[in-house]
From Swiss-Prot:
It is an enzyme of class 2 (transferase). It holds the Pfam family RrnaAD. SMART domains: rADc (SM00650). This is Dimethyladenosine transferase 1, mitochondrial. Residues 1-27 form a transit peptide. The gene is tfb1m. It is found in: Mitochondrion. GO terms for biological process: rRNA methylation. Its EC number is 2.1.1.-. GO terms for molecular function: DNA binding; RNA binding; rRNA (adenine-N6,N6-)-dimethyltransferase activity; S-adenosyl-L-methionine binding. GO terms for cellular component: mitochondrion. S-adenosyl-L-methionine binds at residues 36, 38, 63, 85-86, 111-112, 141. Keywords: DNA-binding, Methyltransferase, Mitochondrion, RNA-binding, rRNA processing, S-adenosyl-L-methionine, Transcription, Transcription regulation, Transferase, Transit peptide. It catalyses: adenosine(N)/adenosine(N+1) in rRNA + 4 S-adenosyl-L-methionine = N(6)-dimethyladenosine(N)/N(6)-dimethyladenosine(N+1) in rRNA + 4 S-adenosyl-L-homocysteine + 4 H(+).
């Protein structure tokens, strides 16, 4: 894992403050885009330090907005900074930073959810997966509305070694709502233990670095924000395809308030549900009366391994979709297990 970064001696020339940039270009945070600006450069410097040593690094910043974190990244002495910004209103301010940094900033007007990061940086930066992480980093103050789908997308690309992970074990330093940050890093039996905990910790060393109070942002969000650092493992804890792990974990946590056998059961069609659920839990040596939050990574590893074997024996099993069965039962006027529907809406 990279050592904690130290901001380099490089400094941008005098520039308008972030607050002045916002006034100069008449920028306002758009509520529908979940935008919140971080103006305190001491905090943006702290975020960048948590990314590790960025001297001569290649960095992709997600959603730079008015450029607070962007300035801190440039001051860390990076070789090149790629910024991906969806909102055209921020482009003029980012161009100003590019000029001030002698062309170190590449500006992409686009959506990070669809941007091809496998083409973002020079090929010579690629490192073998079992080597140290490449000198490539992802940093971003993520809009709340995209943070969860984005990290799930990146985790899948990490598992497949595609997207930003074509360069190797690319590290990420990202902001999330405090609750999401706690879920990503939650340990076994903690209240915040969730699907995100397993999916992230299966593939990465995940560290909740520090919390930024909501009052530090403009406009002030209703929640605090957590800064999370991800360093991909050489080998995942669960050596199964991402889709297999995701399906098992999602199913188990579908009924987080109940015993884990409820979630396991929805992996199987109604006609074989009881038999297959008992078989899977027995072969995985998992107590059916444990709650989902009480299951360790080893429990999930065993569950995924057994489920994969069962899918290999029954090629149609993986395609089974409990939600579709539930929809058909509703159309036919059949009732669901008490509380089942409420849990599925969560």
């Amino acid at each position: 894992m990279a050592t904690q970064g130290v901001l380099a001696k490089y400094r941008l020339p005098p520039l308008p403050t972030i607050g002045e940039i916002i006034k100069l270009f008449n920028l306002r945070a758009e509520k529908q885009l979940s935008q919140n600006f971080l103006l305190d450069l001491k905090l943006t410097d702290k975020i960048v330090r948590k990314a590790g040593n960025l001297q001569n690094a290649y960095v992709c910043e997600v959603g730079p907005g008015p450029g607070g974190i962007t300035r801190s990244i440039l001051n860390a002495g990076v070789e090149e900074l790629l910024v991906v910004e969806k909102d055209t209103r921020f482009i003029p301010g980012l161009k100003m930073l590019n000029e001030a940094s002698s062309g170190k900033v590449q500006i992409v007007h686009g959506d990070i959810l669809t941007y091809r990061m496998d083409r973002a940086f020079p090929k010579h930066l690629k490192k073998p997966w079992d080597d140290d992480p490449p000198n490539v980093h992802i940093i971003g103050n993520l809009p709340f509305s995209v943070s969860t789908p984005l990290i799930i997308k990146w985790l899948e690309q990490l598992a497949d070694r595609t997207g930003p992970f074509t360069y190797g074990r690319t590290q990420m330093t990202l902001t999330f709502q405090k609750e999401v940050a706690e879920r990503l890093t939650a340990s076994t039996s903690s209240k915040q233990r969730s699907r995100l905990s397993i999916m992230a910790q299966n593939l990465c060393n995940v560290k909740n670095c520090f919390t930024i109070p909501g009052r530090a942002f403009v406009p002030k969000p209703e929640v605090d924000v957590g800064v999370v650092h991800f360093t991909p493992f050489i080998q995942p804890k669960i050596e199964q395809p991402f889709k297999v792990v995701e399906k098992v974990v999602r199913s188990v946590f579908q009924f987080r308030r109940k015993y884990c056998h409820h979630g396991v059961s929805i992996l199987f069609p109604e006609e074989s549900r009881l038999k297959c659920t008992e078989q899977m839990l027995r072969l995985a040596d998992v107590d059916p009366t444990l709650r989902p939050t009480e299951l360790t990574m080893t429990h999930f590893k065993k569950l995924c391994n057994v489920y994969r074997e069962m899918c290999d024996q029954n090629p149609n099993l993986f395609a089974y979709n409990f939600r579709e069965e539930l929809r058909m039962r509703k159309l036919q006027g059949k009732t669901t297990e008490e509380g089942e529907e409420d849990d599925l809406q969560r």
